């Protein structure tokens, strides 16, 4: 049974953020099969609707049974029944913020608007000391979203990403909610021996 405190509906000036439902599988498939959208994400584009349905079930639908969570379908207000993206906080000690958005919606500030709304909901719900996010150094626009919602870059590390089997340098961003401002979660720093601190200016 789904928990009503998990992923409560949110509205912003241009967006509706809601839970995914099984009927969203075709729209999610369109997003997950786009090679450009998924270029910097840690999975290959999905090939079939069945794969998208499995992704939807495992990463979204099944998670709504837990006590709290923030795993949203991002919809335009004028078309609330069709997701154009997703934004979520992953379970685990990193409290990692992740997101994806279809290409026709890029460069309009929509993901910043969605991510900011989720961060504010996390603050209202309480319980998380900080949020983190990472982006491939070759994808600085994703880092722009992180900066726009108040995150700052704390360090960079190199990781071999599965299943793509590629070495990637990631910038690690953090936003402290209840921790002191200078607190840095070092989980990725400690688990990846190739790491450094960049002068990124943010």
Segments (PLM) and residue ranges:
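Acyl-donor (CoA/ACP) binding surface of acyl/acetyltransferases
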Residues: 1-39, 71-202
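A short hydrophobic/aromatic micro-motif that marks alpha-helical segments and, especially, helix-coil
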Residues: 20, 48-50, 63, 165
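Hydrophobic residues in alpha-helical segments
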Residues: 32, 41, 63-65
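Conserved GNAT-fold acetyl-CoA-binding loop/helix
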Residues: 36-58
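Sparse recognition of residues in long alpha-helices and their boundaries
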Residues: 44-45, 68-69, 162
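A short helix-loop-beta-strand connector motif used in the catalytic cores of GNAT acetyltransferases and
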Residues: 59-73
């Amino acid at each position: 049974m789904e928990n009503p405190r998990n992923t409560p509906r949110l509205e912003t000036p241009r967006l509706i953020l809601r839970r995914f439902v099984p009927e969203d599988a075709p729209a999610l498939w369109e997003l997950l099969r786009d090679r450009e959208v998924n270029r910097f994400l840690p999975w290959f584009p999905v090939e079939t609707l069945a794969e998208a349905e499995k992704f939807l079930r495992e990463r979204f639908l099944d998670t709504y049974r837990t006590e709290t969570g923030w795993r949203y379908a991002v919809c335009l207000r004028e078309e609330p029944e069709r997701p154009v993206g997703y934004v979520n906080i992953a379970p685990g000690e990193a409290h990692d913020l992740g997101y994806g958005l279809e290409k026709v919606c890029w460069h309009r500030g929509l993901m910043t608007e969605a991510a900011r709304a989720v961060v504010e909901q996390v603050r209202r719900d309480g319980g998380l000391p900080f949020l983190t996010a990472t982006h491939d150094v070759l994808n600085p626009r994703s880092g722009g979203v992180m900066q726009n919602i108040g995150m700052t870059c704390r360090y960079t590390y190199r990781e071999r990403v599965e299943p793509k089997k590629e070495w990637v340098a990631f910038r690690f961003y953090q936003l402290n909610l209840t921790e002191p401002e200078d607190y840095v979660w070092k989980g990725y720093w400690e688990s990846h021996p190739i790491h450094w601190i960049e002068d990124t200016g943010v």
